[in-house]
Amino acid sequence: MAKGKDVRLVITLECTNCSQNPNKRFSGISRYTTSKNRRNTTNRLELKKFCPQCSVHTIHKEIKK
């Protein structure tokens, strides 16, 4: 049986460049879902991932649900 809250959280990462870029291929904002360990990573997660709307690798930041 598990005690307390789960350590792993499911989070959403959103592209920081999509809202500022007028030369996008598609409309919308790129979002990825992933999980993080609450004990090891307490601050907000930032990863460099590919954005299909911008067609480049950009920084994706964790957003609130």
From Swiss-Prot:
Subcellular location: Plastid, Chloroplast
Flavoprotein keyword on record: no
BP-aspect Gene Ontology terms: translation
Coiled-coil portions: none
Annotated keywords: Chloroplast, Plastid, Ribonucleoprotein, Ribosomal protein
One Pfam family it belongs to: Ribosomal_L33
GO molecular function: structural constituent of ribosome
Disulphide bridges: none
One cellular component term from this protein's GO annotations in UniProt: chloroplast
Family: Belongs to the bacterial ribosomal protein bL33 family.
PANTHER family in UniProt: 50S RIBOSOMAL PROTEIN L33, CHLOROPLASTIC, LARGE RIBOSOMAL SUBUNIT PROTEIN BL33C
Protein name, entry field: Large ribosomal subunit protein bL33c
Species the sequence originates in: Chaetosphaeridium globosum (Charophycean green alga)
UniProt lineage: Eukaryota, Viridiplantae, Streptophyta, Coleochaetophyceae, Coleochaetales
